[in-house]
């Protein structure tokens, strides 16, 4: 039966309740950088309960809060651009969602922005196409030579790496998935800006790029000496190109 033709007054049909979807942008600081993706979700579930927000629940024998999060962050990394979609059973002001959650979330997790989006808006996870990172590299890199070394690295027609899949490992060319890479080092140390493909179609992790770059320079790669910070997750806006997941989507 076509959805538009359903008569909800008939016995056996229940008209679905209207839900309101709020996209929140939040940080993941040093205090919580070793908390994994699933634990972040549980953390939000508890915070929503404590905040007494009118969250929507799934139907069935084991109802759960309707919330989802964008691309998982590498364990040990920090971020200022994490996103989640939270469905509410009642319409409330977006600033209230942000305000009340920030009262109950732990140090290191802070809601920076909240917008009400339409049901037609792609989920945060589905919309991702790119991600921006700052990499805090170790002292093996020469700050004065770094920009030239990056340019030489990117001049390669292909950059082959061994990538793990669910079943095995395979050699993959990642060159087209590196949108930008540059030296942004300062007096505090070696820093590299990365702009990479991300999401369900193509997903390139910053640590894969850095391992490949160190190998290109014939330097030992010690992964625990390098820190990663995600600046933002990006979607492709039909009018403006790549924008943050929380930009140009709010209806209030």
Question: What residues fall within each predicted segment?
Answer:
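Short amphipathic alpha-helices in soluble, non-transmembrane regions
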Residues: 96-105, 146-154, 209-210
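Hydrophobic, proline/glycine-rich low-complexity stretches
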Residues: 2-26, 32
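A contiguous pocket-lining binding segment that forms or flanks enzyme active sites
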Residues: 134-170
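Helix N-cap motif at beta-to-alpha junctions
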Residues: 89-94, 139-142, 199
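N-terminal ordered "arm"
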Residues: 31-54
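Ordered, amphipathic secondary-structure segments that act as subunit-interaction surfaces
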Residues: 80-134
């Amino acid at each position: 039966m076509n959805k538009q033709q359903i008569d909800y007054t008939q016995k056996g049909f229940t008209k679905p309740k209207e839900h309101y979807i709020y996209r929140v942008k939040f940080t993941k600081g040093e205090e919580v950088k070793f908390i994994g993706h699933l634990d972040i979700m549980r953390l939000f579930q508890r915070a929503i309960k404590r905040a007494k927000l009118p969250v929507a629940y799934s139907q069935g024998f084991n109802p759960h809060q309707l919330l989802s999060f964008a691309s998982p962050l590498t364990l040990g990394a920090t971020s200022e651009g994490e996103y989640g979609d939270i469905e509410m059973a009642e319409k409330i002001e977006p600033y209230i969602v942000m305000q009340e959650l920030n009262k109950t979330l732990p140090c290191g997790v802070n809601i920076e922005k909240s917008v009400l989006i339409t049901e037609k808006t792609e989920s945060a996870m589905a919309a991702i196409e790119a991600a921006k990172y700052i990499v805090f590299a170790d002292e093996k890199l020469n700050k004065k030579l770094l920009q030239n070394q990056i340019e030489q690295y990117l001049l390669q027609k292909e950059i082959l790496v061994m990538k793990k899949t669910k079943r095995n490992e395979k050699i993959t060319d990642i060159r087209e998935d590196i949108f930008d890479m540059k030296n942004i080092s300062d007096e505090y140390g070696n820093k590299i800006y990365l702009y990479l493909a991300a999401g369900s179609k193509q997903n390139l992790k910053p640590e894969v790029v850095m391992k490949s770059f160190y190998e290109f320079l014939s330097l030992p790669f010690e992964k625990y000496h390098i820190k990663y910070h995600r600046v933002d997750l990006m979607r492709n806006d039909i009018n403006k190109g790549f924008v943050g997941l929380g930009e140009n989507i709010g209806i209030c």
